[in-house]
Amino acid sequence: MSNFSGFTKGNDIADLDAVAQTLKKPADDANKAVNDSIAALKDTPDNPALLADLQHSINKWSVIYNISSTIVRSMKDLMQGILQKFP
């Protein structure tokens, strides 16, 4: 399971830049894993173990990017709601 070190109990993240920075490393790691899995398939594209590894890497990448997108959208909505309440 991925460890999002910025999202631990008692650790406040106050702005969107901090959220993006916290999610950058897991996203980069997932992207590298997908690229490495694709590179491993170049020699033996019909290897079931390598295909399963690629599928796992893509699923992990997808989950991390969905989490990132959801968090950024939530922060945007929160900030937009706060700004709309100002006169």
From Swiss-Prot:
This is Type 3 secretion system needle filament protein. The gene is sctF. NCBIfam families: III_needle. Component of the type III secretion system (T3SS), also called injectisome, which is used to inject bacterial effector proteins into eukaryotic host cells. YscF/SctF forms the external needle filament that protrudes from the bacterial surface. The needle is not sufficient by itself for the formation of a pore allowing translocation of the Yop effectors across the host cell membrane. Belongs to the SctF family. Its main location: secreted. Keywords: Plasmid, Protein transport, Secreted, Transport, Virulence. One of its GO terms (cellular component) is extracellular region. The secretion and/or polymerization may be controlled by the type III secretion system regulator YopR. One of its GO terms (biological process) is protein secretion by the type III secretion system. The core secretion machinery of the T3SS is composed of approximately 20 different proteins, including cytoplasmic components, a base, an export apparatus and a needle. This subunit polymerizes and forms the helical needle filament. In Y.enterocolitica E40, the needles are composed of 139 (plus-minus 19) YscF/SctF subunits. It comes from Yersinia enterocolitica. Pfam families: T3SS_needle_F (PF09392). It is found in: Secreted; Cell surface. Induction: At 37 degrees Celsius in the absence of calcium.
